[in-house]
Amino acid sequence: MNKLFRSKSGVLVSILIVFALVAAACGDDDSESGSSVVDTPADDTETDSPAEDTEGDSAEAAGEDYSDFKVVMILDGSAEDGGWNTTHLRSGNRMVDAFPGIDFSYVEAIEPGQPATNAFQDAVDAGADLVIGTTFYQFDMMEVADENPDTYFLTWAGFEDQPNVGHFSQATEDGRYLDGMVAGLLTESNIIGYPVGFPYAEVNRGLNAFTLGAQEVNPDIEVRALYLNTWFDPAIEQQAAEALANEGADVIAHEVGAQVYATVMAERGGYVFGYTNDWSDFEPEAWAGGFLIDWSTYYIEQVEDIIAGEFTPGISYGGLAEGWIEFAPYGPAVTDEMLELVEERKQQIIDGTFDMFAGPIFDNQGNEVIADGATIPFAERDFCCDFLVEGIIGEIPAT
């Protein structure tokens, strides 16, 4: 795994305002804060590429019992949102499979701020050995972590140093690039719609990677981006989907939560890509495919290290090569010839022989943002991007 260690720096501070604006990142904005503790996780979602469970197999074979180890996961929305939180819970379930008997529970609909601080403290008081925060809970978590050095904490997209805290983020660009290739091959209008939630680094990075992937196979495409200022609002997302379809988009990818894009594309004879969940059974004729995030590799590694007394704080960032990105089944419109191209590029990303951000790359204002011979190193991608590449119709909103 590419495990990165960064201390607080000017680069990190510069993104602080953006993270604060989207502190409820990737959750359900309409959810009320709550503290519903659930001891029995939802069933795992099957995919074509399940995470390897070699550690779990060996633990089970050895008859080891992990019932004395307690993990509590803090979700910022519903575990059944069909998106971000469902993905985290799916990864948590895979962690459970790797450690027979492990005590795993989760708490839903916890907003950043005092509700999150209270939830972290409640988890500690309940005897948690490890607490996992699935959105930008860094500041809420740090206060509790500092006062409880014998409990370990993991939080998404954080960066501050603490001996008992780890941070993690996912290289969604690996999956987005390959989804973009398929989209570029499927579109007939050469117009692809791409509604997103908020204008922060991971969103822009994925949008750029998707566009670059589509341009590799179809240089004539344009990607129309809409920033919706929400992670989940079916009414707003319905309007966005219809507006994009009316502008000629016959393919839609998205980084927001509702399934309305599939419905609209099915009605219009187009195709939809999912965001980190398998919706292939919903409007199957319109389903094109979609990458999935799997944090279980990271979760399992952290539990192993804690049990062994070898926990290492810092930032972890993983993609295809690290097993953090996989794919849902492709839809019926995706041909074997398309898949052959995608699989070849996928293997090159895993091997490190292909660099999607190799320059020269220009933004959609005509500025060279990555020079010829330059790139964005994998270790620095977590904080990209504050630009949109050429071929994207749209602007990053001011924050």
Predicted feature descriptions by range:
Residues 2-13:
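Bacterial N-terminal signal peptides that target proteins for export
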Residues 14-15, 63:
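Residue-level marker of regulatory loop/turn positions in helix-turn-helix DNA-binding domains and
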Residues 15-17, 74:
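Alpha-helical interaction segments
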Residues 18-19, 189:
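Alpha-helical transmembrane segments of polytopic integral membrane proteins
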Residues 20-25:
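C-terminal motif of bacterial Sec signal peptides marking the signal peptidase cleavage site
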Residues 27-29:
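Bacterial signal peptide processing site
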Residues 32-399:
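A residue-level marker of the well-folded mature domains of exported/periplasmic proteins
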